[in-house]
């Protein structure tokens, strides 16, 4: 059964062309569809609190484990598919820098001596970033969490070293190579376009490995905390409040959704927070204690989680859901209606407006959303 699913998935993936969806730094929405098995989240329906977390753990915990490095299929191979540059399939997108880089220019490949420093190291080769640092709970390569590809991202070698084991939080100074990132002594702030991706990886990890088991069958529980944890190798990581905000500000895009599908094709487990972003509200947010149901994504939570971005904008507005036969109205701050437009099967709106602040009213089948947008 797993073999059939995997073959079907690969066929679907290979059908993509370079123009199907965008990279993280120029995101698209609504092109890549989630292929969630019909009953995948069924046992989580109607649950809340710890019961909901336990059900999600049971759903995603029994995944297929691949070796970290091997002559057979390993994490290097999977990442070259999951993080492939949609605009150049010979390349992959590196986390933090957003750089498109030849898949072969990686640690240990031996094929790119022209890029090496005098001591034989390749400071700009790519290696594997553990988004949840491996030293915070699973330091051994034989541990399942160590090789979980949901937690791995291709990264510039020197940038990976700079991030180290720092927590994620706002603030710091601009990094000299990953120029969209900020860092200080105890934290790392990724680029705006990847913030939500990072947050959802960490949300996955804290559900998947609560509890986790190392190669000696000793248990550990990963936990997100609301503070930074410098010089600490406990299985904790911060900063939860910042991660929740990043999850809100940077919604799931096509690149992230496609990555989830690729990894599911190999590991046979999914990231629930990519499939159902509203789960964050039920585990850490305003809906704690309320029963979650998968069908909520199709009703009131659509409008509650609907977002418009980027904001400020140069004139192109994106919605994080696809709009089909729904009306958009634009008003000045004085209440004058400037534009009314029917949106059909798209999530993008191009505006030709003077610089200023406007109110966008979205009249959808889920409800009405009023948003203040800055055009610059």
What label would you give each PLM region?
Residues 18-19, 287-302:
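Low-complexity, Pro/Thr/Ser/Gly/Ala-rich linker/spacer regions in secreted
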Residues 116-294:
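Domain-level detector of nuclease and nuclease-like folds
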Residues 1-21, 336:
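Bacterial Sec-dependent N-terminal signal peptides
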Residues 299-376:
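C-terminal outer-membrane/trafficking sorting elements
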Residues 16-60:
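Boundary/junction segments of secreted and surface-exposed precursor proteins
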Residues 53-173:
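Betabetaalpha-Me/HNH-type nuclease active-site subdomain
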Residues 96-102, 206-208, 363-364:
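Short, flexible beta-strand-to-coil junctions
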